[in-house]
Amino acid sequence: MIIKNPIIKGKFIERLNRFEAYVEIDGIKTLVHVPNTGRLKEILVKGADVLLEVREKKGRKTPYELAFAYKGKRLISIDSQVPNKVFLESIKKGIVEEFRGYELVEKEKSFGNSKFDIKLTNGKEICYIEVKGVTLEVDGVAKFPDAPTERGRKHLKELIKVKEEGMRAAVVFLIQMDDIKYFTPNDEQDPQFGQFLREAFTKGVEVYAYTCDVGENFINLKNRVQVVL
């Protein structure tokens, strides 16, 4: 996925709340939008090099969107809207071997009390996919979530119901960076999510994790990595 808007560099100063932060741009302290409500405390540290997408649009409080951040030499995409777009694009292009062969690819489709990111249909065969973006990395291991997620637990429960009704169900952890050894649930932050994920897997819900090739104006699906439950 190519980011077509201009990208500029900055230095992270501080986070004000879930949606706003200050970044130094050309020596000026500037308000920017943070497109991720996660904690990101390991990434958004004072002095970190960041990349901002410039979105000129009426009604915006600031034209600057905090799109990427460097953690050492590792470039991480932090926009929480990106994983769905990248994975949907990859399925449509036939890149994802695990989800090839479906005639109809739809996004944001409801099932029960949840709305899943992707619905695939091939005749009578139906597959629901929930995509979770992963930005937390510890010693080369990707983890999710970085904060307790009631919504994430709810999605896993609904995916179990999908499977029980005879359809295919999958949760995909899209790791918004490269050079990852494996993925594992973050039991330290949300032990219940880890329990639900393991239960879902034992009941037939498919669990996948993929890394991404991340550049200063693009992010593309790269490799499937091991999931350690």
UniProtKB/Swiss-Prot annotation:
Gene3D superfamilies linked to this entry: 2.40.50.580, 3.40.1350.60
Membrane-spanning parts: none
Top-level taxon of origin: Bacteria
Name of the gene this protein is made from: sfsA
Pfam families: SfsA, SfsA_N
Name under which the protein is recorded: Sugar fermentation stimulation protein homolog
One GO molecular-function entry: DNA binding
Family: Belongs to the SfsA family.
HAMAP family in alphabetical order: SfsA
